[in-house]
Amino acid sequence: MAKANIGKLLLTGVVGGAIALGGSAIYQSTTNQLGNANRSNTTSTKVSNVSVNVNTDVTSAIKKVSNSVVSVMNYQKQNSQSDFSSIFGGNSGSSSANDGLQLSSEGSGVIYKKSGGDAYVVTNYHVIAGNSSLDVLLSGGQKVKATVVGYDEYTDLAVLKISSDHVKDVATFADSSKLTIGEPAIAVGSPLGSQFANTATEGILSATSRQVTLTQENGQTTSINAIQTDAAINPGNSGGALINIEGQVIGITQSKITTTEDGSTSVEGLGFAIPSNDVVNIINKLETDGKISRPALGIRMVDLSQLSTNDSSQLKLPSSVTGGVVVYSVQAGLPAATAGLKAGDVITKVGDTAVTSSTDLQSALYSHNINDTVKVTYYRDGKSATANVKLSKSTSDLETNSSSSSN
């Protein structure tokens, strides 16, 4: 088999060489026959001075936002890297004189506000996760220190503060509720890090609302609403701008899908961004409070779909119940315990929203405010029941346990 392959390679080389030589011989013969007849007509090739107007709606849009898009540099202690650095931070691993720290990863950010001597930058939480120090590289090449104003792991957003001394422009946000599938979408950021800062790629909006599941550093999964685009998104684009044809920010670039869940098939053109309306809502709260308070039930849970058939049978569920969240344990003193929920209960609805997984439960729960009362539908010993749960506690009151999701 090896000899056959080598033979094919050699044959290809020989045929290719024959074609090249033949072409040379034909050219030689032709030029000799034409001889002096063509010499008097020979002219040198010149570059044509043609003026082309390259200004388009796309170039104008990029120009409007380019000065407000920055690179975010995450420094950590040597041999300490963020769990997210290999996913979307553009891991560089280069050493730095930044207080003896190492540049662990780079992402992107968007300057959206100037106030006094400060400027505010929105980026993804996973871009800054695990940092010991942060720098922001401006479009003009100046590198400035950044401090964290606040962050929210659930939505994967963070707000940084920098000096406004060298800040030229700030971005404006569009109303993401007015987006239309098929309209132009342009991603601006730092793919693979600051070496390619302010890279722009163009595509369209493929979808205006997708549920995207994220895995946090503690292993818990969350589900967020996202814009889908086929504009090229690469490692390092995280936290950058997705803009419309007017140069307004319609989303903060967050992630992309590169393969199917089982890894068997590669995919292209599946990029996601957090919608601008959601971004504005979160960053305003982060500026004020530094964190986002969300209601908590006070349970540890596991998806019904993750149970073995033997474990599922012990729950005595009707055959019509194929999805839900199994209460693994209940935290004393929190809303679920107060309302009478117990380990082994299977939650199938929160309010009017059907629950088939823990991400469904979180999405439904987080649509409510602290101190709201919500009806929870569940099954116990095969029978359906409901409980009115007053959401008097927040996620900050939860005990964490990596063996199961908490809420």
Curated annotation (Swiss-Prot):
Keyword Electron transport: no
Keyword Protease: yes
Coiled coil: none
PANTHER family according to UniProt: PEPTIDASE S12, PROTEASE DO-LIKE 8, CHLOROPLASTIC
Catalytic residues of the enzyme: 126, 156, 238
Record-given protein name: Serine protease Do-like HtrA
Catalytic class of the enzyme: hydrolase
Cellular compartments annotated: Cell membrane
The organism of origin for this protein: Lactococcus lactis subsp. cremoris (strain MG1363)
GO molecular function terms listed in the Swiss-Prot or TrEMBL record: serine-type endopeptidase activity
Gene name of this polypeptide: htrA
Gene Ontology biological process: proteolysis
Topology within the bilayer: Single-pass membrane protein
Residues annotated for substrate binding in this entry: 236-238, 297-301
Catalytic reactions of this protein: Acts on substrates that are at least partially unfolded. The cleavage site P1 residue is normally between a pair of hydrophobic residues, such as Val-|-Val
Keywords of the record: Cell membrane, Hydrolase, Membrane, Protease, Serine protease, Transmembrane, Transmembrane helix
EC numbers, comma separated: 3.4.21.107
Domain of life according to the entry: Bacteria
Record's function text: Degrades abnormal exported proteins and responsible for the propeptide processing of a natural pro-protein and for the maturation of a native protein. It also plays a prominent role in stress (heat shock, ethanol, puromycin and NaCl) resistance during active exponential growth.
Null allele phenotype: Inactivation leads to reduce the efficiency of secretion of the recombinant protein produced, although the protein produced is completely stabilized.
Transmembrane spans: 6-26
Ranges of residues in domain PDZ: 301-382
GO cellular component, one term: plasma membrane
